[in-house]
Amino acid sequence: MRILITNDDGILAPGIEALYQAVGDLGQVDVVAPDDAQSAVGHAISVLKPMAVRRVHVNNVFHGWSVAGRPADCVKLAMIELLDQRPDLLLSGINAGANTGVNVLYSGTVAGAIEGAIFGVPSVAFSLQLSDELDFHKAGRIARLVLDHYIRAGLEPATCLSVNIPRLDKGWPRGVRCCPQAPLNWDEHFKKDVGEDGDAIYWLDGRLPDHVSCPDTDVEALRDGYVAVTPLRADLTDHRRLEQVTQWAWPQSFA
């Protein structure tokens, strides 16, 4: 089996090293990841400037390609230029922080996996809920258990799974829940300051509201201590609404 790994925390992040170590015995593992942190870049790609690419050896654990670009860039480069053949499986992560609810749209980790699915490759994004101490080694073991189950079930082309691992400082997960994204927005605000040149500067800050119940969703699964598995796809069409919108009295001509 050939596996491609990417992430959005950067090629030197502990999460990608833990993921590599967790799956290294499954076959040939290639790593193509951003040269620095790309959190919350979503599915952005680099079209206005070239990307520098260099080979690196990370902590005597793995060799990989370090890319001055986004996670989706890394996947495109791997699929089109860097690898001599398409991988059988793409993994993205392990991200420092959960990617649940609306975060899926912002997440570079998830975007890397969706980009893999666009290329027809079965893809999985792994994210670890934040806590005081992030145990990526344990998260890697959990990721491997989830992955082994997926492989036994049969890898489907062009599919994407988002796997969120609950905080591990309170013990091992209670199990796995397959569930949709929560329809939950962040409570957001900006911290305002003044820069050295006197211009106003703003820092975005926020958190998911703890008091809002989201039964049978990824957010609630993590709250209950379960691994949340959510199938995703690049098609954002609201098919139920599409049928309704089609019935509107649209103009038949714009001439």
Where do the language-model regions lie?
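Short beta-strand segments
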Residues: 6, 32-34, 92-95, 126-127, ...
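Short glycine-rich anion-binding loops that position phosphate/pyrophosphate groups of nucleotides
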Residues: 9, 37, 70-71, 95-98, ...
